[in-house]
Amino acid sequence: MLIGYVRVSTNDQNTDLQRNALVCAGCEQIFEDKLSGTRTDRPGLKRALKRLQKGDTLVVWKLDRLGRSMKHLISLVGELRERGINFRSLTDSIDTSSPMGRFFFHVMGALAEMERELIIERTMAGLAAARNKGRIGGRPPKLTKAEWEQAGRLLAQGIPRKQVALIYDVALSTLYKKHPAKRAHIENDDRIN
């Protein structure tokens, strides 16, 4: 059985073109979502996936109707394949029921994976270059080294941690991370406050 899926985009608010193409392709049932593909919660797609059985084919007008990212598409088509369900995209000439269609889709998947790895590699190289220039990522430290040392001296003088945390406007947990307490000190701090 051929099951169709249509989705509107922000550019094309009418599904008639998609719907007509799916009807001409022989789809017996068509499910529809009237929202952008950026949302992951698509009730029409969920209903279509639930309806599909082994041997059926999910048909879309174009790949981007099914998912915005290649990673999502490959994951979805992989799930379909595991369930014994084929996939067809009319305008992209992809049909996973044939060996050539499966091969073409795998090549697209490999290219998407390579692109993702290249992005990670470039990001890591950029971060390393920034570190070499003395730039550190993340937010600037709340206190200077001297302020942390001063906070440590206050704690050593017996000032309660809560009070020191208030003085320096830091969370109590941050203070514990910078100046770990011995077990006896923790119990004393709890009794004082």
Curated annotation (Swiss-Prot):
Its main location: host cell. It is found in: Host cytoplasm. Residues 138-183 bind DNA. It holds the Pfam family Resolvase. Keywords: DNA integration, DNA invertase, DNA recombination, DNA-binding, Host cytoplasm, Hydrolase, Late protein, Ligase, Viral receptor tropism switching, Virus entry into host cell. Belongs to the site-specific recombinase resolvase family. This is Serine recombinase gin. It comes from Escherichia phage Mu (Bacteriophage Mu).
